[in-house]
Regions:
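Terminal, low-complexity, charged helical segments
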Residues: 1-4, 25, 134
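Generic L/I/V-rich hydrophobic alpha-helical segments across diverse proteins
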Residues: 3, 10, 37-40, 112, ...
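Short amphipathic alpha-helical segments that mediate assembly, nucleic-acid/protein binding
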Residues: 3-6, 30, 66, 82
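Short, charge-rich amphipathic alpha-helices with coiled-coil/heptad character
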Residues: 10-45
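Coiled-coil heptad-register positions
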Residues: 21, 55, 62, 69, ...
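Short, well-structured hydrophobic secondary-structure segments
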Residues: 34-67
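Amphipathic alpha-helical coiled-coil segments
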Residues: 43-54, 90-113
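Extended, amphipathic alpha-helical coiled-coil scaffold segments used for oligomerization/tethering
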Residues: 58-97
Length: 134
């Protein structure tokens, strides 16, 4: 499953967490919340794996590119310095895009995790108020 597909599934399950009632948006019933939270948490685990995989690819690509910068000089020419190679790496468009993509997914995961935590708090309040009614 690709990252974009996981995010699309997350969006679907997030939409089920809330309902419109009388022009207001409020949490869905406790069973719907609990079921969708489980699905969301499962998808978050998949996203963690995807982020780890993309960061590994980024690091390997960056290291290989760095090595190629250091070794890519003609005989008799002075080799590029490590700091110049690092500066050159910082300007590589594909590496920049890889890093930004990974950061976006990590930030999205933080948002979804915060949303789940908030919904879990709502569930606790709802279940404790139901228990106090008995």
């Amino acid at each position: 499953v690709e990252t974009d597909e996981i995010i699309a599934q997350l969006d679907t399950f997030q939409a089920r967490l809330f309902i419109r009632r009388n022009g207001q948006v409020e949490p869905a019933d406790p069973n719907t919340l609990a079921n969708n939270l489980l699905l969301i948490r499962g998808l978050l685990i998949q996203l963690v794996d995807k982020v780890a995989e993309s960061e590994s690819i980024y690091r390997k690509t960056k290291a290989a590119r760095f090595d190629s910068f250091l070794t890519a000089h003609k005989p008799g020419e002075k080799a590029i310095s490590k700091s110049a190679a690092m500066d050159k790496l910082d300007m590589e468009d594909d590496l920049i895009d890889m890093k930004i993509g990974s950061e976006r997914v990590k930030n999205y995961m933080k948002y979804v995790d915060g949303l789940c935590t908030s919904i879990q708090s709502v569930l606790k309040v709802q279940s404790s108020s139901e228990k106090s009614q008995y």
